[in-house]
Each structure stands twice: as C-alpha cells, then as structure tokens.
Amino acid sequence: MLQSRKRPIQQVSGAGGKRRRMANRAPNMYFQQNNMFAAKDLSHGRHKPWSALGAWFMGPKAENGDLFQDLVTKTIDSHIKFRRHIYFPCDPPYVTDDLREAEAYQASKDKLQTELELLQRQMQNSVPFYSTRYKGHVNWDIAMPANLGYICALLYNQNNCAAEASTVTTSFELEVGTDLCVMMGYEKDKSMGHLVTGGTIANIEAIWAARNVKFFPLALQRALKKEEKLAAAKDYKVFFPRRGKMGELTGGSEWELLNLDTSSILSMPDDIEMQTGLEHGEFMDVMSDYLYESIGAPEFARRHPLIEKTCVVVPSTAHISFTKAVAVLGLGKNNLVKVAVDDDSRMNSGVLKDILDKHLEDKIPIVAVVAVMGTTEESSIDPLSEILQLRKSYSKKGLDFAIHADGAWGGYFCSMLRDQPQSHYLKPPEDSGFIPRIFLSNYVNEQLSAVNQCDTITIDPHKSGFCPYPAGALCYKDKRMNTFLQITTNVVYYHGDMTLGDIGLEGSKPGAAAAAVRLANRVIGLNKNGYGRILSECNYTAKLLYCLWVTLPEEDDNFIIETTKPLPEKWKNLSQEEQKRLIKDRIIGKSNEELAKDEEAMEYLKEIGPDTLVPCFTVNLKDNKSVDVCNAINMAIFQKLSHSSGERTAHRVPMVVTASSMLHHKHSSALKSFKKRLGLDHKDDNPVKFIITTCMDPWASSIEFFDDLAAIMRNTILCAIGTVKDPKSNHDFISTGVVDDENRVIVYYAGNFSNASKQYGTVATLKFNSQKQAKEYKEKQDALLKTSTEPQPIVFRSKANTTLHDVLFGESEYGDDSEKFDCFVGLPTDQSKPFMSVNMKVLDVPQFEHFDDEEHPEFSSFFMYGNEKSAFLFHIPTKKPDFLQIVQLDDIPKGVGTEDDPDLLLKHGIEVQIPDLSGSPTIIAGTPSDPLKKLKYHATFVGIDGVEMKTTVKIDRKIYFDGTTINY
C-alpha cells in the first residue's frame, strides 16, 4: 500500500521555506520572476554572451513572435517583389481582376481558407517540441535563422539535384558541407560534405563508399593483369601494412588487397590515370568490367571468394540504419556484427578486440567499424580513441578497415571544441555570464577530439543543429572517397560547380534545407560561443536533471530509481551514497550563481551523467524482483507522459518523455548489471524498459523549473505504481449537478487516505452517451434542488471493478469507448440502490494526482475548473485529516482568460489558493469542518505567462462538503 507522504520539495536559495505543492498544476517554471537575464547583468550596458540565445529561437512562449512574424513578412514581401518587379517585369499578369471575381475563383479561395484553418486547428494537437516541458526524442525548437532560411528558399522551390535547377542553393549546400567538415576537424581543402534527408541516408552512403573502397584493389589487380590499356601501370606499387613495405599490387594476395589502408586505395585512380595517361572517364570505363558495383555481388564473389562473408562492425546500440545499410548493399543482415556494450552503454573495446582477433584468424574482411558519437537512447559515446588505436595495431597485423563515426546526434558537440573566429560579430566573452554551461567531460572531449581521424562522419543539423527536417549530412575526410560510389564515370567534382544528384543516394532534394542550415551556421556559428554555447547550456540542464532523477526517491518511499548510466563507484574517494549527499547538499536547489562559484560541484557535474544530453532511468518497487512488474510501471509512466493518436490534448501531458528497452547481448554484462542495481531477477534475458528524458532546452536553468519537473515526475511515478499495483475497486465520482448543452458533467473523485485504491485527488468531465439518460439525470437533479438548497449530490459509481486509472484512461471493457456507472443520491453504502445506470465517456481529466504530502499547505488550495458558463472550486486534499468540497462560483473570476478566450485557464484547470484560509483544516469534534463561512474570498493563482494573479471568487452554491469519508 502507498502511504500518504510528502513529495520532495527543494529549498529555494534564500527562501528558507518549503515550496508549495505543485504536481501537474500551473507550474512555477513560467513565473515571471524567472527572467533569463538578471538586472545586475544588464546594467553594464551590454548583453552577456549567453544573451545571444534569446535571438536564436522564437521562444517556448513565442516571446520573439513579433520579430519572427516581421522577418517572415519581409521574406514573403521580398519574394513577391521579385516575382512582380525584378524577374521580367513587363510580362503580363495571368491572375487578373476579372479572374479573381469569378465564382470558381472565389469558391477555390474560400476552400483554401477553410482547409487551412482546419489544418491550423489540427496542428495545435501536435507534439510541442519547442516547450521546456518536452524531454522526449532528440528534437526541440527550430532555430529562428534556420526556419527563416527554409521559408525564404522554400518560396523559390529549388531542387538541389542539379546545379541548373538550384544555382544558388547548390552553392549553399557546398558551403554547408565545408563548414561542417571544418567543425569536425577535417582539413578544409581535402574534405567534403553534403546534405541528405537524414542520418539513415548518410549512414547507408558511408557504408556504401567504404565497401566500394574495400573491394577496389581486387578489381584493379585483375584489370592490371588483363587490360592492355593499363599496361603502363602493370608494375604499380602500393604499401602493404602487414609487410611494412611497398610491393607490386599485382603480387598481393587477395587477403592483403582487402586490408590495404584507405588512403592508399583512394590514391589509386589518380596514380593509374597518371601512369597510363587515361582520363578519369576512360579509366573507369575500363574498370567497369571488374568493379563490384558494376558486375554485381555473385560474379564478384565468384572471382574473389574471400569477400563472401564481408561484414560491418557496429555497437549493439547502433541505429537501425546500419541494418538497412547491409541489407540494401547486399552484404546481408547476418554480416552486421554487433559489439557488446559496457555498463555505460559504450562499445566494449575488449569485446571488439576479440572480434578483430577472430576475423583476422578466419580471414573475414571488415568493411568498417562504426563508432556512435552519441546514441539517441542511451546518450553514450563510443571509445573512438581506443578504436582508432586498434585499427592502427591490427593494420600492421594485416587487418584493416574504415572507421565511420555516426555523429547524427553528437556531431554538433564538436562545436564546443572550436574557437570563435575573430571576424565573428560577437566578441569573445570576458566571463561565462549568469547562465552556467557545462563543457564536455574529459572522456567525451577525448573522443570528439579524435573524430577527425575517421574516414566518414554522419551529422544531422536537424537534431543538435536545431534545423528543420530534412537536414542530415555526411562528411568525408578525403573527398576522393565519394567518387568511389561510381554514380558517374565522367566527372570528378573536386571543386567548382557540382551536380549534387551525382554524389549520393538521393536525386531530388530541397534547396531550402541547405539555405536553412547555412543561415543558422552564419548567424549562430559552429564554435564555442555559437552552437557550442547552446549545447553547453543544454549539457548543464542534462547534468542537473540526471542529479534530480538520482536523488528523487526518499528513504521511506516504496520505489527506487536507477539511471542507465550509474554514478561513478568512487569520485574523489566518495562512495555513491556520499555522492548523492553531495548532490542534495551542493547541487539540487542551488541557484546558477551559487553553483557557478562551487568549482568542485561544477567539476563533478561535468564528469557524471549522460555523455550527450539524455538522462535515462528506470523505476522499480523496493523488493520487487519481477521484470514484468517493473516494465509495466515504466510503461505506465511513458503512457502518462507521451502523446498518442488518441483524443488527449497536448495540454493534458504536463511533461513529454519517451522510452526504450535495454536488451540482452550475449557478450555484454550491461543488462545484468542494470537488473542487479534495480533489484530485479537477472537470471533471464528479458529486456528492461527505461524512460528517456532528452535535454535540448537551453532555457531550463531555474531552481523552480527543476522543482516542477520533480513534482510532475514524482506524481507520475506514484500514479504509475497505482496503475499496476492498486487493488481493484469500484470508484465514486461526485457530480456538480450541472449538465451542459452537450450532455457533459464535471465530477470530483471521492478519494480516501486509508484505501490504497483511492488515494487520489481527481477532477474529470464525463459525457452521457444517451440524450435520454442525460435528460433523466437532469430531471432527478432538478427534483433534488426543489427539496433543498444544498441537497445530497448525485454520485456516479463505476460498475467495473478496476483501478481508477483504468476507469479514466483505460480501454473500456464494454467495447464502446465508454464506462458504465450506477447513479446514487449521496455516497452509496452497502444498502444503497441506484436510481439509474448510465453509459458515459471520459472526455477530460484535468487533475489526476496521487496523495503524497505529510504536511498541510500554508493556505487552503482549490482546483478551479469549468467553462464560460459554469465555474467550480474543488478542494485539494493533502493529508489526513482533510476534507472533500465542491462549490459553484457565481461568475468567472477575473484573470483566467484573454480577450479572445475569456475562460482559457478555466478550461485547462488551475490551482488557486485562498490566503484568508489556513491550509490546515479546522477540527470540530474530531472532524474537519467547512472553512467557507463567507460568500466572497480573495484568491491567488499563476496566470497567463506565469504572472502571479490576484482575483476574487464569489460562491453561488455549495454543492458538497464531507470531512468524514476521505479520512476513514
């Protein structure tokens, strides 16, 4: 049974008192006092460097909406001007005034407006990636420069497949490719990069290029032996790593030719063309009878039997795109070799070494070893520096391979390593400013510093580059590697005009994507004070959130939390428990200024937690060994905090997360170790589900923000445990007695502190499925009102014996998207008989909280909910003793809406406090008494834009009060 107790409330610096209870009502993360800029920081007459972020995004509340709207309008005006007055201004118009007056034109225009308005309404239920509440996938708000660049170029609809179809945006893509290569540490003149629709395409292309490079020496050897046109190069020599010296290519064994180093192979076409005097196209025409990509896999394998089991090596955490790559390229899914990961979900270099030993012994060629620079689930960066060392040592043994870095997620973190160019408009900062930023851990720094030694790198501007889809990219250390794709045999695009359709998988692709990335790069900058600043502030948020999850459970809770990446076993001789104490004492609840001054705490933050912004965790019950129960709890958390295709609107999801599962791998101890930490049975191979909380939010830097996330997550965990473990029961909902024109009625749950099934505070809207039943209900309610001004309320009791969660959110056992209720006058007893039974649909659940306090609040708190016709207050119970109460207000209080939507907050539901009433109930004869002695009270609440509001509530009718039922 879950006992009533308090939620973890952090101390606000300097406040000295506990925060008021929050849960998922009107969170303080939007209080106006939480300014991004402190007054003292702006008083110097210049912005600190971190203030630039304010101009890079529209803002979670569209704070830069006016600026964005103005720039979009100017962008559209510029395009209209181009069409009208710049491009052949003497051309006559087609859409004339007469045409616009035609009925068909007007009908089409009206249809356009109607459908667009419908689309706009539908899109408002989309996932709110831009919100500080969003902690799900590796996706967040789009940088304003990127959005504006996309919109500007979109109007011109350029196709970057061919230069003549995209004269401007092709050059943009070339510029972007170069900039990304430089950010990754490649030499500007030797490297190349280009955009693709996403990381999947980039990864496939990288393996495609690596495979073709791997097999090229075999084809060339055969051609040198057979082709008269290549006779002048018959004695062509290459360096054989295993021999440690030069030798004739024609004299190399098949195994030796499959293990030449990449740079030697990339030089072969140029060398042979120089020795033979052939043009590149002529040489490739000769080679077409020998290349894998020309003659096909069966014939090439017949000629070169060793290639039959050629494989690609990836960590077990690798993206599914590599499975697609080996399938599409004909290598076969069975030849995708997965390396086990360690307890930090990083590729285990010891296991990789064993695999390399086995492949060397069995003479199985390896096309490439893939290092993931930031998994999007576990947030881990593979030990690239060790992988590079292994290649160096195994090359000398006769086993060589390309190395591809999948930096789709983590690639942009290299911006944190790059200094700001002196020509940039922002001067280098004198100090770090008000908002702290956490740079890369020593381990991550080492790995990202080594990516410039990889042959290819995938990087996605539409992930950590905050650009719109589709915008992935692939960078080549040596631009010559791209020509081995052999898409065209006639042109080598080393510089000058490039037909981008000839350098990758894709043909048509939007020039708008290139414009978006280019403008973002130019405005923000691919350096420490551009993207590096954004990501370092996000890193600060991620480390704090990691600390929050580590310390969220309290000693007397019945649940534990384990992060997928554990705390260090030791840090400066501190045990894990001592580290948790350090987190609680010196990190959680501290202001940005306090943390920035605590060098040891900041050093600790830098080294712990996720490699790349994604803290993950699993919740389990104490003493629970069942993986199924653990997974069910975490699935319930995910379902509560995620969007679905159902009817639940976006504002009913107080925080958005996602989830995945840690899977078994025969050579990995990661799952077993994770199960041990969770107290689960680790003898089987069943996967364990975990919650993913991605931190791509540079705004999340206030104490209040983390308090609110803690409250939301804690309530979600308790409700999820209840979903799985609550004993089944019938549930009573007290009616407000008011049915609107659409047959909807608001109800209040009759919770109980002592009954594990009913330890909830809940308000919901139900809808009668039948007009007849709604009419019968209203007639009964009217009859009751005629007998008394405060009659017993009508109570809906669920007929199904189930959990409260399943009544409100589960699939109906009746199969008609509704629940069945019996209707009683007053709370039913064992002797009560229902006066009718109804089928009702649960339309809205604005409040669903598990009791979790051991102290009453300072002031009495109510949940205000309703619509423009009826407003109600529902008392929020906290701890025993307390009471249940419903009152109807005589009017909508001021401050709960806007001019366009006067009942906005009322429809959402908000917590209000009445300062004149103590949060502790008045006890008379051992029972709480009704505190509402007057008809009018002052009330406070968090209003629109986080402004603290004061209003007056006037009571029209007291519907229900009970100080007994909830306590016994």
Annotate each predicted stretch with a short phrase.
Residues 154-164, 187-195, 304-309, 334-341, ...:
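Glycine- and acidic
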Residues 24-191, 201, 214-235, 239-284, ...:
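N-terminal entrance/gating region of PLP-dependent enzymes' catalytic architecture
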Residues 379, 416, 428-613, 617-628, ...:
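Active-site C-terminal subdomain of aminotransferase-like
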Residues 374-377, 404-417, 661-668, 733-748:
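Short, conserved secondary-structure transition motifs
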Residues 142-155, 173-188, 328-330, 360-365, ...:
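Active-site-adjacent bridging/hinge elements
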Residues 5-7, 18-21:
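Positively charged, lysine/arginine-rich intrinsically disordered segments
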Residues 198, 202, 209-480:
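Conserved PLP-enzyme active-site core in the AAT-like
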